[in-house]
C-alpha cells in the first residue's frame, strides 16, 4: 500500500512538471525542449522551435491553428541554442528565463524586470491574442508582456508606440533573413519628435514614413480604413502616443510583418487555400521612398511627364542640370521674390497631399484652420501650414506650421489632405488664375460656356429625335408583317444612329431587315447553323449570290445587348487574315443582327472533339491552325489600331474556312485597352470554364496573359483531341492530366493517334505541347506574351524554359462517352452559353 501511495505522489508530481496542455507556466514549473503550452482557445503556442533545416533552437510564439509555420515573436532571437538541451524556467528573482541547458546558471534571455522575490504566486500565461504575460493570477497585475517587446510582427490588439512614464518604446525590428530571426537592420517605430507619425529606417537612414495622423488614418496610407476589417484606436496625450489595430471579425486571422528587405506587409490567412494572402504593403512606389524628390520638392506617381518629381509652387530646382538628368536629390530652393513677408503674399492650396515630415513642425491643437493661416502669415519664417486632424470626428482642428525646408511631400489621386504653401503675389496669381478677380471671371466664363453647350445639345437632341421618328415611321411602313414591332427601345434608336453614321462613313455597311429576311428565307429552320446565349446563327444567300452567316440577337437574351454593341464597335475596326470578317449589321425594331462572311467548315470544336472529323486533321493542318490562331491573337494584342483582349478564346469561337485557315470570332466579351495598358479588372466575370485564367475566374483580373492562358488550353486540346473541361482518369481536367504525364515523362502518350504517326515529327509536337504548358502556368507573370509564343512556334532551334506548375481551373463535368455536358455547375452561379459561354456575377466579399 505504501508503495502505491509513493508511486501516486511521484506520478502526480511528474504530471505537474511535464503536462503543459493549459496556457500557464507556474513559478515552480519549467518547460524543456519539446514541451509546448497553448493559449486557452488553442490559437497560439509557446515553446522551442527551429526554422527550416536549421538545428538552432529558439523560444517563441507561433500560430497553433495555421498549417504553415508562422512565428510571431522570438525571445532569444540573437542567442540561439545549439541543441535540444534548452530549458525555460523562473529564476530565483522571479524573471522568466531561457537557459542553454538544464544545468545552466546564466540565462541567455530573461524578462529582466524588477526583483519579484516577493511575488511567489507569479505565473507566465499565454493569451489567445498571442501575448505572453507575467502576472499575479490573484490580482491580475501584469509585470511584463511580450506585446511590449515586439520582434518583426504586429498582431491585432497589440499596442504599438511609446509610453513616457514607463519608458516602454515598442519598436518592430526585422529578421536578418527568412531563416534567421536575429535582429535585422530594418526598424519601424512612432517618431517621438514633433507631430506623431510612423517611421521605417534602414539602419540609420530614414526609408519610409506614414505621414501624420489625420484623425482617421495616416495621411501617407490612403488604403488605410477602419470600416471593414479593423477598429483603429489612436492615442496622443502627454504620457502616451500609440496605435492599436483591433479586428472587427474574430474569425479573421491577420498580421503585419516588417521584412528584411524594408517592406511592411499585412497578411490574412486563407483557410481554404491554406496560405497567407498579402493585401497591403509599403513602400508601394518610388514616391513612397523617403524624400525621393529632395527638399521642397514633391512626387506625383501619376504624372504624365517622364519625371515624377516637381518643385513646390514658388520653388525651383537647386541644380537644374541634375533635374534634367532625372536626379532630384538636391531638391528645390525658393525663387527669389520681393513680396515675401511684406503683406502681399498668400497661400497656394495643394489638394490630396501627404504633408511634409512633421518631426520639426510647431503644433497648436487649440486654434482653428483660419487662425492657423493668420498665425503663419504674421510669422516671416513660416513657409506652410495645415490642419492637424483634418478628419477628426469633431471636424478639422489643430494647427501645424512648417519653418524651413519641407521634406517628403507627395500627391495622390484621392485621399491625402489639404496643404497651404506660402507664395509671393506673382506666384499666387499664377496658381489661382490671375488672382481672385481673375478666378471669378473664369468661373463666369465657364458658366456661360456650359449654358451655351447645354442649349446646343438640347437643340441637337430635338433634331435627332424628330429624325428618328421619321426613320421609324418609314421603316414601319416597309417592314414585313412577320416582324411587326411590339415596342421600340430608346437605346436601340441610339445604336441605330451610331450604325448609320458608320454606314455613311463606309466603316460598316447597314443591311435592311427585309434583305436579311429574304437571304435566310425568313430565318428558316433548315438554314439554322447553331445557337448560343447570344441567339441563333443562320446561313443566308444575298441576291448577288454571296453566302453569309447571320448572328441574330435573341429577344430573351439577358446578356446580348452589351455584347452586341461591343462586337459592332470592335470588329468593324479589325482586319486580319485570322479574324472573321464582318460584312455589316442590321438594327430594326427589336431585331439586332451581325452579318459575317460564311465559313463552310464550321468551328474548330466540330473537328477536334469528334472522332470522324478529327481524323481529317493531320499534324500539318493542326500546326497551321495553331500558328494562325496565335497570329490572330498577336494582332489583337499588339498590331491592331486598338489593343484588345478577347476574353473568350475557345475552340467553338475559332471558325475554319474552306482551306482550314482559322478565323477568331465572337468579340462580344472583348475589352479595348489603351496603348500602354496591359491589365484590368471587373466584377462581372464572363467567359468559359476550362479556358478562363485563374486570376480572371477567381478575382476578376484580366490581361493579355488571360488570352495567353486560353490559347495554351487550345494548343493542348488541338494536340490531344480532348476537351479541357472533361475528367481524365484521376485528373480534374485535361491540363492536370497532361501535367501529370509531363512530370512522369509520359507526355508523348497523350498525343492524338488519329493524326497518323507518319504525318508528324515527334520533336515538333512535343515542342508545341511544351509551349502550351508555358501558356497555362498558374502565375500570369510566368506566362510568355503572344509575340514570344508566335516566335517560339515559328522557330525550332531554340531552348524553351521549363514550365512551372499550371493552373487547374475547374470546369463542368462532362460525359466523356458522348462529349455532352451535365448541369453540375458550382452552386450559386448562373450561366448561359454561346457554344458554352459562361457568365458569372462575382459579388464583393
Curated annotation (Swiss-Prot):
CDD domains, sorted: B_lectin, EGF_CA, PAN_APPLE, STKc_IRAK
Region (CaM-binding): 612-629
EC number: 2.7.11.1
Domain of life of the native organism: Eukaryota
InterPro entries the UniProt entry points to: Bulb-type_lectin_dom, Bulb-type_lectin_dom_sf, EGF-like_dom, Kinase-like_dom_sf, Pan_app, Prot_kinase_dom, S_locus_glycoprot_dom, Ser-Thr/Tyr_kinase_cat_dom
S-S bonds: 287-299, 293-309, 372-399, 376-382
Cytoplasmic topology ranges: 463-845
Protein name (database record): G-type lectin S-receptor-like serine/threonine-protein kinase At1g11410
